[in-house]
Regions:
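Conserved class I S-adenosyl-L-methionine
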Residues: 40-50
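Short loop/turn motifs at secondary-structure junctions
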Residues: 40, 64, 112-113
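Conserved SAM-binding loop of SAM-dependent methyltransferases across substrates and taxa
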Residues: 51-63
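Class I SAM-dependent methyltransferase Rossmann-like catalytic core
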Residues: 1-40
């Protein structure tokens, strides 16, 4: 039987090999593969987005037609961020709905709202 450390190392190595920022990407991939939460063209809010791996997965799933807004207390660095990604450094619990929705930019169609809200954080 493998140890917890070996399992952790497996997912860490997989994340590195596939170019994800962290192994947490596989958690969202697993959830979305089973539940089909994120669709092409969706507008996604990732609350507590650091280090950014859920944003990476969400961007792949929404395609160019969709948009992803990530907010976190920590700065999330992104080299050559796509135009359909907006990263906000701030407190999700203090952010106004308007400031989050502004992140949708030109992807604001129909009712101005998010189709999916993701979070892998603990708020306290």
């Amino acid at each position: 039987m493998s140890s917890d450390r070996e399992v952790w190392d497996h997912w860490y190595r997989q994340a590195q090999a596939q170019g994800y920022r962290s192994r947490a990407a596989f958690k969202l991939i697993d959830i979305d593969d089973k539940r089909k939460v994120i669709r092409k063209g969706d507008r996604v809010l990732d609350a507590g987005c650091a280090p950014g791996s859920w944003c990476e997965v969400a961007l792949q799933r929404v395609g160019l037609e969709g948009a992803v807004v990530g907010i976190d207390l920590q700065t999330v660095e992104w080299r050559e961020a796509p135009t359909n990604l907006r990263l906000i450094e701030g407190d999700f619990l203090q952010a106004s709905a308007e400031s989050l929705l502004e992140g949708l930019g030109s992807h604001r169609r129909g009712p101005t709202r998010f189709d999916v809200v993701l979070s892998d954080m603990m708020a306290f």
